[in-house]
Amino acid sequence: MGSTFIAYTLENIKASPAWTMPPYEQIICSCEAGTRSIAVGKLSRCDHIPSSNFIIQRGPVGTLIVVDSGTDICSYLLRADESGSEYHTTSLSSLPESLCVIPFTTCTVMGTDAYVYNNSGGVLTIMWMGSSIYMTITIYGRHDTFAKTVDNLHLVQNCSRQFYPTVVAEPRKDDPQQNSEAAQVLSKSVPGFIEYVGANPTDTLHEHTPPILDKFPHISGEDILIEALREADLRMEDSQCSPVNYPSPMPYGFTEDSCLLESVKIYP
């Protein structure tokens, strides 16, 4: 049973006051810089984030996090158990040293050229310290069976335009494909994912081609992880943030392999 850890560190935060209209909550923020780290087993990746805007929305069915760098956008939808009455035990807050812990049952990640769904649960934490915010998403392993995602995949085709949160600060334009890489890395790294990608990356989601589910056979999560890393030729780093972001194309097929580390090229 493997787990995946995603961590955002955002510095020099400018946040709007928390907006609350029960049962909905929202915080809109901007940051001058930050990092995003993804760890799967013994492998890890860390990228620098440019000046960006982000939005945190919370409702009765889940929590939505959107990170917008101006040239690209990535969103995380963490759905809650609808039968869990303890979901709203804590409220979103931007006060210093505030902490919010939110459990979830499924995770959906969407970028401009990727749609990834995982039917494993986990925990989201949001902590404010001084002028920085720390957000972590921990996904616990995978279920034995895949969730049905056909209806969800059709939602991607019906999206007519991208959504950008209210602008708080002017983002830099010099780092394209920054945030969509999060979805791409997750699709190759998290066991149990079903993914959908268009044949050609585009600026709008509605131009994706229809999903072809038979390209993704039902195999073990370890096999998916091994082959995805090999197909994508990921640049994996050991505990250091890479100064630039490398493109990470989505894999289009999976086969078996016996050695995980041999499938990953290590770059200095």
UniProtKB/Swiss-Prot annotation:
GO cellular component, one term: host cell nucleus
Superkingdom of the organism of origin: Viruses
Transmembrane segments: none
UniProt keyword terms in alphabetical order: Host nucleus
Keyword NAD tagged: no
Location relative to the cell: Host nucleus
Family assignment from sequence similarity: Belongs to the alphaherpesvirinae HHV-1 UL4 family.
Protein name as it appears in the record: Nuclear protein UL4 homolog
Organism: Gallid herpesvirus 2 (strain Chicken/Md5/ATCC VR-987)
Higher taxonomy: Viruses, Duplodnaviria, Heunggongvirae, Peploviricota, Herviviricetes
